């Protein structure tokens, strides 16, 4: 007997190899046997990947086990090379489970999730991103999530996307945390199944920012009350950065305005373009506090079709 590649698979065809599939004569039993072989191969590769993940953990030492920029690069590469009828959304979901399981193999990994009174689906977004087996604790306040990440009791915190003019927004607390190594490092969902419906979350962690190749940066900008959104956007663009969303804190009597600025591209804490915004002579802002960098998520259109056809 022998085996013969047919339409990308190997079929056992007996003593005289023939293109049974082309002739429409492939038996269901033969196809099922081939699927079993593929399943075994996939399982072998997952076990091999897990062994490598353990070796990576040994090489990392005390380095953080979670690298969201690296995860984004993996998923982008897979979507780029994908073809055939298998749904892209399902491909991402499978790899998210695999990646998250591998992260947990490398060390302690706990997630703190903010679940406010008005549910904004942080719980569901966290489950979808980090997997059904990821250990999670749920908190009624954003400040508790920030504290859990800062003191190390949680590896990652999940907080709802800020909205304009929120009272006591969590991002101002993050900006005011002294000697802070915690920053935003991911945005959820990374692979939305439908166009944006307003639901979303940021992940925070005590890890150094890394470039993924397509990123967005977050800064808290303190300005005088006379600075309008339009003027601030113009100044950001003049500094060489493409502006994104501007979220404002409600006006107070301390004679300052504070904006959460979402900027296109990677900009770290010492970025020269940010320094232009706070230049004492002609800068528009009195201070700029780095809040984080996250890999740009997929658009729903990137993964909405059934496959790569």
Language model region names:
Residues 6-7:
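Acidic, Ala/Val/Gly-enriched low-complexity intrinsically disordered segments
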Residues 10-309:
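Domain-level signature for soluble enzymes in the chorismate/prephenate branch of the shikimate pathway
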